[in-house]
A protein has these predicted regions:
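A short N-terminal helical cap/helix-turn-helix that marks the beginning
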Residues: 1-17
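Residues at the C-termini of beta-strands that transition into short coil/loop
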Residues: 8-11, 22, 29, 123-128, ...
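Alpha-helix N-cap/helix-start capping motif
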Residues: 12, 60-61, 104
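Conserved AMP-binding/adenylate-forming core of the ANL superfamily
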Residues: 16-60, 64-68, 84-89, 137
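Structural core segment of the AMP-binding/adenylate-forming
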Residues: 44-45, 74-137
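Hydrophobic/aromatic ligand-binding patch that stacks against planar heteroaromatic rings
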Residues: 68-69, 113
Length: 137
């Protein structure tokens, strides 16, 4: 069975990987670079391979890219952005997540629960091409 990283490495750098209507395609080369950048950002935030990271983002190319890249550096748990505060509290506590990734500027129930649980909050800022982003704490 191949690991996710191996599956990505098997594609030519110029091949399209992630797209969205009206946006440029992210290539596999872009995805490989993003994977390294995400790993560096997570390690700088104190997140290791055995840690759990919840992702609370709208469906779309950034969610897809975040899942694929974070999963290569930590255990990843995508959560539904529509959850209410008590649902986030249940899932984040059950997961024992060390960190949560949210969109820059998001101030909803997931962030409030993460702060209550003293989790690391990582903000994702989308850019171009589709799926591309930066992370900051």
């Amino acid at each position: 069975m191949q690991r996710l990283e191996e599956l990505i490495q098997d594609h030519p750098d110029t091949a399209n990987a992630i797209g969205a209507p009206g946006r440029d395609w992210m290539t596999y080369g872009d995805l490989k670079v993003l994977t390294l950048n995400v790993r560096q950002a997570l390690r700088a935030a104190g997140i290791g391979a055995q840690d759990r990271v919840a992702i609370v983002l709208p469906n779309g190319p950034e969610m897809a890219a975040a899942f694929v890249t974070v999963a290569q550096s930590a255990t990843t748990a995508p959560l539904n952005l529509a959850y209410k505060e008590d649902e986030f509290a249940f899932y984040l506590e059950d997961l024992k997540a060390k960190a949560i990734i949210v969109e820059t500027g998001y101030d909803g129930p997931a962030r409030r629960v993460a702060k209550r649980f003293d989790m690391i909050v990582i903000e994702l800022t989308a850019s171009n091409p589709a799926g591309s982003f930066t992370l900051s704490t």
